[in-house]
Amino acid sequence: MTIMRKKHPLIKIINHSFIDLPTPSNISSWWNFGSLLGLCLIIQILTGLFLAMHYTSDTSTAFSSVAHICRDVNYGWLIRYMHANGASMFFICLFLHVGRGIYYGSYNMIETWNMGIILLFAVMATAFMGYVLPWGQMSFWGATVITNLLSAIPYIGTTLVEWIWGGFSVDKATLTRFFAFHFILPFIITALVLVHLLFLHETGSNNPAGLNSDADKIPFHPYYTIKDFLGVLILLLAFMILTLFFPDILGDPDNYTPANPLNTPPHIKPEWYFLFAYAILRSIPNKLGGVLALILSIVILAFMPLLHTSKQRTLAFRPITQTMYWILVADLLILTWIGGQPVEYPFIIIGQTASIAYFAIIVIFMPIAGMIENNILDLD
């Protein structure tokens, strides 16, 4: 078996990636989220495949087909809720994974980091299109509002929106193409994940100390396979509690009303994992400015290697930047809360303040804190 593991052309790749992979001996549970994201992706592809067998992407039957899945298909309700809440678990793991990368300076592995940002965009696009498919009120109006933002692009905006819609409004053509893209994108994401891993294995993993760990590596299996398995059990426990006891807690009640173009819901909002970006979008009164701020809220991650001023890689030994980091986390939670609130006083001013703080912390305060720490520790 050992000979086959090390010699067989295909098994050799798996061996070098998951079995004999040299791994730093001190990586903590924050490094579990990569494997958990892989698990989430597998769950989403499998549940999505079974949903696609019964779903119809037609405006007249889409809502009914989802109801049919929940009522008449064997364990259809479970598959549907696993898929819906699986997306939430996916994003929880994603945000923690990115947060870990920022905290421990993993963004200095530039190719891996940039590939991760592309993956984040791809997953967000997939989730957005998936939210449109049940064809409830929030599906329809969410699709209308978010796609309509592209009309802010000068000259080509309106034409572009009508091209995406396949007509003059969100209708049958839009739903059909969104279903097609929602189906294909997870497989593209899987390919991008392999590229992400390829880049990661070129440099090796980072570690909590941020130091070179070449002198102290251990094989991935059995040490980290068993550690990852514990993370998998905890994730599945949380996932099953969410799916079986509170399946609708993260959803919107409006989506249980069939889509009606003549009746606008009182508060149009996306799923909870987009609320922080939605709050940033709404905090700018100008349409184009809001769209740019929305895109920049994610693209700014690509500039983190350039904004790294400290001589140390991680925040483990940098209390000033640590404080800035946790203020940023709190700020993102505030933005998430604001994104779900109506556009009125005092939520408007809180959202604008939190949006300014988000960009200021990343672009101004964290780099300055890094320079101050260099001075204090005399690392110049």
Swiss-Prot record:
PROSITE patterns on file: CYTB_CTER, CYTB_NTER
One GO BP: mitochondrial electron transport, ubiquinol to cytochrome c
Necessary cofactors: heme b
Binding site for heme b b566: H97, H196
A molecular-function term among this protein's GO annotations: metal ion binding
Entry's localization field: Mitochondrion inner membrane
Residues noted as binding heme b b562 in the record, renumbered to the chain: H83, H182
Predominant location: mitochondrion
Keywords: Electron transport, Heme, Iron, Membrane, Metal-binding, Mitochondrion, Mitochondrion inner membrane, Respiratory chain, Transmembrane, Transmembrane helix, Transport, Ubiquinone
One Pfam family named in its UniProt record: Cytochrom_B_C
TM segment ranges: 33-53, 77-98, 113-133, 178-198, 226-246, 288-308, 320-340, 347-367
Binding site for a ubiquinone: H201
Signal peptide: none
GO cellular component: mitochondrial inner membrane; respiratory chain complex III
UniProt topology in membrane: Multi-pass membrane protein
Chain's role: Component of the ubiquinol-cytochrome c reductase complex (complex III or cytochrome b-c1 complex) that is part of the mitochondrial respiratory chain. The b-c1 complex mediates electron transfer from ubiquinol to cytochrome c. Contributes to the generation of a proton gradient across the mitochondrial membrane that is then used for ATP synthesis.
Oligomer status and interactors: The cytochrome bc1 complex contains 11 subunits: 3 respiratory subunits (MT-CYB, CYC1 and UQCRFS1), 2 core proteins (UQCRC1 and UQCRC2) and 6 low-molecular weight proteins (UQCRH/QCR6, UQCRB/QCR7, UQCRQ/QCR8, UQCR10/QCR9, UQCR11/QCR10 and a cleavage product of UQCRFS1). This cytochrome bc1 complex then forms a dimer.
Misc. comment: Heme 1 (or BL or b562) is low-potential and absorbs at about 562 nm, and heme 2 (or BH or b566) is high-potential and absorbs at about 566 nm.
The name this protein goes by in its record: Cytochrome b
Organism: Microtus quasiater
Record gene name: MT-CYB
